[in-house]
Curated annotation (Swiss-Prot):
A zinc finger (SIAH-type) spans 109-232. The keyword Metal-binding applies. Its EC number is 2.3.2.27. A zinc finger (RING-type) spans 56-92. Residues 1-37 are annotated as: Disordered. This is E3 ubiquitin-protein ligase SINA-like 1.
Length: 366
């Protein structure tokens, strides 16, 4: 049987060692039932007596992942980011784009007990603790029972500086770091926690091959070369500014167009959803980096005297093809006007380069 309470054992260990890591007795299931068991492991933990610090400062509910922060460090839960229209109520900066990774790790590492104390219900996440007085610490009976919201941080090293490994003290600053370099890769720096935001706009972000059963992924230029070299039978060439007939039936579901050898890849997809009709999407496989894969397009479908036209001033850029029915940026063809023979007739697309159009406008202004 374990002698003394856990608190008494912890106090004895603290007196025996001045180093920050504490060696605690971790009981096994057998030991808790009365038999000797368990082993000695080094566990660093601490108690937080203000557990409401882990509540969302806007809605006051317990923080859950994902947790977001603005550029000034104010945090909010995902629901509140939506409710405040992604505008921080404290500083009016944008919030909802950048994850607060350290807060997410801290919240995950906290352990709280059931709020039921001695058979009586207490308020949420509150428990009764013995707070010793000075006399009690000197050996005399004292102290008092108070109800405080508290929890145990099971990974105390989360509160250490990741550089020097010493305990963090105010002021604490965000760390700037390099994106993991690939060969001849990106050297841009950004705040810690903003990796995903940067990667979407980074020209070195990975793009995935649209060919069926192909697992290739690489930077967009390498992907274009890979597709031209390995999947020639699967693509059709397009030229900017020229309307072309789209030869694809309902069962194909996707068609890949390539501007020229090693050129940009454009994916046309159709999603048939009976009895509604057909959803058409057009996307360029490219990162959202400036000057990469910027196109506009016009898609049209004609049958039995009916013509539908969809124009987009800027084609969506994606890194990986999705096979989910789109919720926006699509052309919808009702079931009743679909050609029973499929889409071999009457479907045309015209793709234009936005960069070329911008250059022409500049030349005309000159």
């Amino acid at each position: 049987m374990v002698k003394g309470t856990n608190a008494e054992q912890a106090l004895a260990r603290e007196e025996a060692s001045s180093s920050r890591p504490k060696r605690q007795r971790v009981p096994s299931i057998v030991e808790e039932e009365g038999e000797n068991g368990g082993g000695d492991v080094v566990v660093r933990s601490g108690t937080l007596f203000e557990l409401d610090l882990l509540d969302c400062p806007i809605c006051c509910n317990a923080l859950t992942i994902p947790i977001f922060q603005c550029d000034k460090g104010h945090i909010a839960c995902s629901s509140c980011c939506t409710n405040v229209s992604n505008k921080c109520p404290y500083c009016s900066l944008a919030i909802g784009n950048y994850r607060s990774r350290i807060m997410e790790r801290v919240v995950e590492a906290f352990i709280v007990r059931c709020p039921i104390v001695a058979g009586e219900a207490s308020s949420s996440r509150q428990k009764r603790l013995r707070v010793p007085s000075i006399d009690e610490e000197n050996g005399e009976n004292g102290g008092r029972d108070v109800v405080v919201p508290s929890g145990t941080l099971s990974q105390l090293d989360l509160l250490d500086c990741p550089v020097c490994s010493k305990a963090l003290k105010i002021s604490i600053f965000q760390q700037s770091l390099f994106l993991a370099k690939r060969q001849n890769g990106c050297t841009e720096t950004f705040s810690y926690g903003n990796e995903l935001v940067h990667e979407k706009k980074c020209s070195f972000a990975l793009c995935y091959c649209p060919a069926p059963n192909c697992n290739y992924a690489g930077v967009y230029k390498d992907l274009y070369s890979h597709y031209a070299a390995n999947h020639k039978k699967l693509w059709t060439r397009f030229s900017c500014g020229y309307s072309m007939h789209v030869c694809m039936d309902f069962e194909s579901k996707s068609l890949v167009l390539q501007q020229y050898s090693d050129g940009p890849l454009v994916v046309l997809q159709c999603f048939k959803e009976p009895p509604q009709g057909l959803f058409w999407t057009v996307n360029c496989i490219a990162p959202s980096a400036p000057g990469v894969g910027k196109f506009s397009y016009e898609l049209s479908y004609s049958t039995a005297g009916n013509t539908l036209t969809f124009r987009s001033s800027e084609m969506n850029r994606i890194q990986k093809v999705s096979f989910q029915t789109p919720e926006k940026d699509f052309m919808f063809i009702p079931e009743y006007i679909l050609c029973p023979m499929g889409l071999y007739k009457g479907t045309y697309i015209c793709i234009r380069s936005l960069e070329e159009e911008e250059e022409e406008e500049e030349d005309n202004e000159d």
